[in-house]
Amino acid sequence: MIYEMMVMKRSANSRAQNNRRSERQRYYPYEPTESPSRPVSSLGNVPTIPPPAASTVDVPHYTSRPGSPTRPWSPNRVGNWARPPAPPSVASSQYERADLNGSPRPGTPSSRYGGSPRRPLPPAPLFSAPGGHDANIPINDAGDDDVFGGGGRTIDPNNRASMQSFMSESTIITDEKDAMSKVDLDDEMEETDEMVDPNIHYGPAPEKQSRRGVREAQMSTKEVQLINGELILECKIPTILHSFLPRRDDREFTHMRYTAVTCDPDDFTQRGYKLRQQIGSTMRETELLICITMYNEDEIGFTRTMHGVMQNITHLCSRSKSRTWGKDGWKKIVVCIIADGRKKVHPRTLNALAALGVYQEGIAKNVVNQKQVNAHVYEYTTQVSLDPDLKFKGAEKGIMPCQVLFCLKEHNKKKLNSHRWFFNAFGRALQPNICILLDVGTKPAPTALYHLWKAFDQNSNVAGAAGEIKAGKGKGMLGLLNPLVASQNFEYKMSNILDKPLESVFGYITVLPGALSAYRFFALQNDAEGNGPLNQYFKGETLHGQDADVFTANMYLAEDRILCWELVAKREERWVLKFVKSAVGETDVPDSIPEFISQRRRWLNGAFFAAVYSIVNAKQLWKTDHSLPRKILLQIEGAYQFMQLIFTYFGLANFYLVFYFIAGSLTDDKIDPFGHHIGKYIFVILRYACILVMCLQFIISMGNRPQGAKKLYLSGIIVYSIIMFYTIFCTMYLVVIEILARTGADTSLEVSDGLFVNIVMSLLSTVGLYFYASFLYLDPWHMFTSSAAYFIMLPSYICTLQVYAFCNTHDVSWGTKGDNVLNMDLGAARVVNGTTVQIEMPSEQLDIDSGYDAALRNLRDRVEVPETPITESQMQEDYYRAVRTYMVSIWMVANVILAMAISEVYGPDAGGTNIYLAIILWSVVVLALIRVIGSTTYAILLVVQKIVEGKTKFDAGNLANMSHVSGSSGGRSSTALKYGGGVSFKDKFAEAKWSAKRVAGKAMFWRK
């Protein structure tokens, strides 16, 4: 009985298993049905795609999505396999392929689908009728205006035996291969069944892991007509991108233009290269040329910047009442993206550009007609944008078309070379009015570019404008929990409230940040002799060896400061620089110590040496056409910068002396807050800790990179923070006990009057000034969220950053080295008879034999290998290191002598008799007073400008109303009402206001 039950149970299991197997093998044609997770496609009728060209190859593909139909049967032998016929129901159905030429089909950003990442159509059935490959892009495009010629033939790089075989390595699914070589132990197979040979050969081993549903692109040899001897291609955009574009009425929307540039950027226009804005139906004038420079930033930083730029273009196109902008304002804007090095650019950034239609893989060449390609230029007018979340935004979100020029430099030659491509190549070709510079990672506000442009439109003397850079605080402002981010946020805010407005009033801003700034292209041009701002600006790229002294080399680390000075000091011109507070851009600041130190090393060295250069060459200002009051203001600004330079140079000693005198005051037993000489012990410990950390900073900075000594630098910052915290405590304690003594609350505690006054005035000129200016500009929140972190980390700014910067003056790199190696990974395009482009390879066996014979001769003759001489780069590095040693030694000795001399003359208990401490504290007061005057003046001028603009708009409205009234009433009666009875009181009042405004305009000489 038990045996019969086991047999029946086993038979039932076998039938159930057979039913499941037959259920899997049964094929059901796909019919789209609505489900909660995936609604029915809203496309309706699928557009008919033209049949493929003869050069395409029908390669079946499998979808790996869940729920896709599976193979209905598996052959037991490879040799007797035949393709099963397609069911009639499948042959008549329409579907969307799971891939497009081997690439996964992306989500559609059309408004009809809401930007959903899901495919809008159902996947293709596993076995389809002939013609299921109609989604392939036709390779042969017969057209008179197409630069591609006919006669192309497909190249099979892998030399597969059969592209139609389902056993091919590139098409077979891993699960099926495993099923063919495994035996299901749960199945009772009969002995007559034959197993598939597990050692069957499927072709060569793949070079990399293959992905399901992905087909590698097939290359073909084509004949291409050269234009002026250069390789210029018009390539169709991907079909899926073309399918949802709102506009397809012009070639700039349907084709991407590729140009292989084989010349130097200075010779771009002379060699006859032209951009789309110079030819055909796309010939246009360029008002704004936007430069976005990038190195190895990822796709998140790139999309933040690019999406912000496209939002600004949308805003410019929405200004329908503007004389310059409007619905077609995008035609006056060109976005130029320059990548510094093809091998350095982030692959996913290229993917993002490809998604926009700007970039296509596999069309670039290393060599054209035996000339090395220096830059690959891609041009396309995109109609979609990618936001930082990598979601498509199109016309449904207000995105306007954007003319994109993507320059992919073949070699990594640093940022200055990228700017040379921008100004000397593309700028000369397009002749824009305004050039805007952006860094990848900076997100401009939706109206930032308009406000920058408006500054030039309102004042013809403005040659450059700087926007307000804000530090990124992260989601929910959680980044402020990091003291490094909080301190930088405070620093950026106070610079935009105090420093930039002051410099804008003078007319010379020391630095227009490369992250968000603008220049008038005409003002940048050199004179007839080749001298001018751009000539001086690009000198830093060609300096080598001892010809580039260390001062000049470090000065060009802050290349944006060079342009600022050269513009203001341009001979026989009267250009000024302006700060535009309404042009806001947000950038990510370093949140780790190594990145922070490396960034500030370049900034500090560049700022220091550029300030020295501007002070030494201050006499150039008298050769300009600035008015006399303007020249006087610029000289005053030069004196202010000189004072700042002195404080920077002796910042190390001044910090130690301030700590020595203020913290040393608590060593007196009368005012010791702790008692039992604890104040004296704390002072001695912190004093020696300060000296020890300073000495260690020199050793670490001259021998270690921040990335390799992160803990050492972190330890130094912590010690400096403790010292600063104790110094602040001592300062507040001295002020409190003096106030108590003066009010009579506690007469036993009293400090000298001089020390009290000095401390109070210094506090008012720093903390008080910061609060006043922040509330004046209605932006005080950083005082409550970031000021504490800034004051605690202030010694690290003075000591750690300055020591590392001066100890690395020999390092004049941007963190990258020039790349001059010729890569041939893209192949070479060789011109034959002036028309045909072919790939270079040995033509006959004789060529291979000749190369082999030459190698044998060199081995037989033992040709002496010459010694490698000392390279120019090594000589340059040795020279810079020697100058670094001398400079650091002089700087360190000067600070030590000052600190030792003052500490010997005045003891820690000198109090009010310490003249040097009084000079330091009152100097802080004077510098702060200059900053607050400049900041207040800028705020007043800003209010006056807004009032004048409002008055102008109000008068224009009244004039329009008066014209309307006079036109609608009777002619003679209207004239009598207007002119009869004398002048009205309203006219007299308007004339008086006009006269007052004219007098005020003459008085504001600083705006000339």
From Swiss-Prot:
Glycosylated residue positions: 312, 833, 961
Pfam families: Chitin_synth_1 (PF01644), Chitin_synth_1N (PF08407)
Topological type in the membrane: Multi-pass membrane protein
Cellular compartments per GO CC: cell septum; cellular bud neck; plasma membrane
Polar residues compositional bias, start-end: 34-45
GO biological-process terms attached to the record: chitin biosynthetic process; mitotic actomyosin contractile ring contraction
EC supergroup of this enzyme: transferase
Disruption phenotype annotation: Exhibits lower chitin content, reduced growth under the stresses of cell wall-disturbing and oxidative agents, more released protoplasts, a thicker conidial wall, decreased production of amylases, pectinases, cellulases, and malic acid, and increased citric acid production. Reduces drastically spore production.
Main subcellular location: membrane
Molecular function as annotated in GO: chitin synthase activity
E.C. numbers: 2.4.1.16
Catalytic activity: [(1->4)-N-acetyl-beta-D-glucosaminyl](n) + UDP-N-acetyl-alpha-D-glucosamine = [(1->4)-N-acetyl-beta-D-glucosaminyl](n+1) + UDP + H(+)
Entry-linked InterPro entries: Chitin_synth, Chitin_synth_fun, Chitin_synth_N, Nucleotide-diphossugar_trans
Subcellular location, record wording: Cell membrane
Superkingdom of source: Eukaryota
UniProt keyword terms in alphabetical order: Cell membrane, Glycoprotein, Glycosyltransferase, Membrane, Transferase, Transmembrane, Transmembrane helix
Biased composition (Low complexity): 10-19
Transmembrane segment boundaries: 642-662, 682-702, 717-737, 755-775, 787-807, 887-907, 910-930
Annotated region (Disordered), positions in chain: 1-160
Entry function: Polymerizes chitin, a structural polymer of the cell wall and septum, by transferring the sugar moiety of UDP-GlcNAc to the non-reducing end of the growing chitin polymer. Involved in cell wall integrity and mycelial morphology. Plays an important role in septal growth or maintenance. Acts as a positive regulator of conidiation, cellular responses to oxidative stresses, and the production of malic acid. Negatively regulates the citric acid production.
Designated name of the protein: Chitin synthase C
Gene assigned in the entry: chsC
